[in-house]
Amino acid sequence: MKSKIILLDSIRSMQNVWAIFRNSDWAWFEKVILTGTTPTPPRNDISKTALWSETFIDWEYYSDPFEIIEKLKKDWYKIYSVELDKRSIDYTELFHKNEEKICLVMWNEVAWVNQKILDLSDEIIVIPMRWKKESLNVSVAAWIVMYAC
């Protein structure tokens, strides 16, 4: 079985973070890594959103996302950042990849991803949009890409 983790960098909304914990359980992601200003468990006021999945999904917190990304790369994880970028590949291409170790990177919707994170990424993933908006809610985007993994 693949080793799948997701890294959330400075995501502001607790509801989105806890929704991603719930998505992680559904999509067989074994760990959620929280970095920067992302809120961390335990939070009884919001645990219902995740159906308490934060109690059994492993999670770690790092103040610096680069520290853990570099560690994951040394451990042979492929880093996939989700971002609209000239180097982006369509998320559906993930269905055809057979990587054993993957880490999805999601970030604050307003501040966008840090360029250094993009530079450390093995692939940059995009979810094509049909109309005028160029972004999705972070928990929705995470769910779509997690499904493709």
Describe every region a protein language model picked out:
Residues 1-149:
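Post-transcriptional modification and biogenesis factors for structured RNAs
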